UniProtKB/Swiss-Prot annotation:
The gene is Pdia5. SUPFAM superfamilies: Thioredoxin-like. Its EC number is 5.3.4.1. Keywords: Disulfide bond, Endoplasmic reticulum, Isomerase, Redox-active center, Repeat, Signal. The lineage of its organism: Eukaryota, Metazoa, Chordata, Craniata, Vertebrata. This is Protein disulfide-isomerase A5. Belongs to the protein disulfide isomerase family.
Amino acid sequence: MARAWGLLLAIGVILPTWLSSTKVSSLIERISDPKDLKKLLRTRNNVLVLYSESEVAAESHLKLLSTVAQAVKGQGTICWVDCGDAESRKLCKKMKVDLSPKDKKIELFHYQDGAFHMQYDRAVTLKSIVAFLKDPKGPPLWEEDPGAKDVVHIDSEKDFRRLLKKEEKPLLMMFYAPWCSMCKRIMPHFQKAATQVRGHTVLAGMNVYPPEFENIKEEYNVRGYPTICYFEKGRFLFQYENYGSTAEDIVEWLKNPQPPQPQVPETPWADEGGSVYHLTDEDFDQFVKEHSSVLVMFHAPWCGHCKKMKPEFESAAEVLHGDAESSGVLAAVDATINEALAERFHISAFPTLKYFKNGEQQAVPALRTKKKFIEWMQNPEAPPPPEPTWEEQQTSVLHLVGDNFRETLKKKKHTLVMFYAPWCPHCKKVIPHFTATADAFKDDRKIACAAVDCVKDKNQDLCQQESVKAYPTFHYYHYGKLVEKYESDRTELGFTSFIRTLREGDLKRLEKRREDL
């Protein structure tokens, strides 16, 4: 009997720590067979897999993921693969999991609709992982931004009411939606202001887009995002409406908070008088038929670029319309009122110029100044064909879109990707260097230089998933897995040196394997 107890004690001593000290949810599926993982990815469309160097390395993550699994039950699946286990090693190699660096003990990979989606690189917290699994393509939580540590982040109506009841200091509360572009613009300034006024005023944020916050939206008249409300001792006083403000503007306003001043409505351009003809859905066709040469500016009252161009356009109209020998006229259309015309001419940005010769629409170059308007209207000529875009040029750069991004990268051992916008001046400066780098490695089948135009509609989700916040952004991928953000020199020498270092590492590892044999 004593020997039996001794044997049991011995077994207890060698039991893995996680079995004895970590409560792992039965909702976490442990997998070691590649076929089992393949089957699971085929039948589940939202899977987060924890790959660990060993059982011990996985311990703290398993504790956290056990709670996550319960929170996303029915919406997502969590699996665990112990790469230190002999049976699982083959699976980890097949899934291209590299835990060889000394400081790398675990990896979290997300799979969606049966395919690799991304390496999880957001905050490893209950709230962040749950939010990610409930919306894998959604933006990170605001509180994940290290710069937002001084903003009080509110998650529930209960927490909001508690804050109002207990907070003695003045409170500036931003009600926002995660997808809102205006919110994203002001957030960095809001959080910077929060740091500057810390100890004197509380700045807080709350995502009220979910339907459970309808009561709060109704109570505080949230009709758009963001809506920023000012409170003192829990009592709502008024809204802060300077949504284009900087951190300094917010801090200055908080020194003496005042309600918004009633805005004086702007006089419509058509009512100001002037030399430009203002056309509508009803009279546009007749006007264009009666005038042999018409340049039309489609505009919107709120558009800053339109306001900047308006005096130039008016001055040019005054000159042209006062010249008896000139047959050209300038006209304007408010696209927010005359929606039929805006739709007919596919107006999607402001200002947009359209030119009509004898009633027929013709191409018009980019014109913005009084001088250019006059010169061109005195001698309208078809503009030269636009230069081919980077994507249209014959180069060795792979131009990827959301549909083929993952599959293409998985086929290349080393890929440097440039996320860019065609209008971005920094991008234009880098493009020749990046193109030359791609040409230099065009014969190496394991290397690729790729580019993604983030302005294209079909790429916007992809650029958001890859956390692209500025242009250009460079990411290095190893068989489709994001390894690091490239932040070295943006020159041909910088790019080629980085890639050559990667290839030299490949050769050293190959030589070492040969020596081991």
